Amino acid sequence: VDRIPHMQVVAVCDRLFEEEGTFPDGVRYYQNYKRLLDEKLDVLIVCLTNDIAPDVTIAGIQRGLHVFCEKPPGRNMDDIARIIRCERDHPGIKLMYGFNHRYHESVQDAMRLIRSGQLGRIINMRGVYGKSKLITFNQLDWRTRRAIAGGGVLLDQGIHMVDLMRLFAGEFTDIHSFISNSHWGYDVEDNAYALMRTPDGIV
């Protein structure tokens, strides 16, 4: 936000704050997002655990705020369906998720090449995505608890690969997949595999 000249951080919220107050730079802080939403805001940035991010996103949209939310959109299809309904009920509001990989320079170069048709049409693609050492799936934290996270490495990191596949090839309609938690043994997947095909045959 600090890199965008016409944007200014007005207030922040974190459940770990012991009280409400104001930082020395004038930014106000809250423990409860509902108090934050009482502020005069234009944009809401949601960086929360997956169990509460959908509710906060919806609350922001209903307040008439543009919303940027970290991925994933939700823990399951019910979460996502609620957000879609809310967004459709507020057509003037912009909602964006943190699929930052599609803006990497190499990905943009690939998109230009695909659109140019220089190499012909895409026939198939293969993607492999490993976890970051910064993501602690091997420790018992919220990312290993299905009730909070909704899923494991596929939902948290593999979603980037799925997003890029959709960016390059379009929507997939025929999907065969399986997941396992055989490595760490927690309540979420630590390995995921999928074979996907678009209506026009890209695999």
Model-derived features with residue positions:
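Acidic-histidine catalytic/liganding microenvironments
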Residues: 4, 24, 39, 90, ...
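Core-facing hydrophobic residues within beta-strands of well-ordered domains
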Residues: 7-9, 41, 122, 172
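Short, Asp-centered acidic motifs that coordinate Mg2+ and/or phosphate
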Residues: 11, 43, 94, 124
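Active-site beta-strand termini and strand-to-loop segments that position acidic
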Residues: 194-201
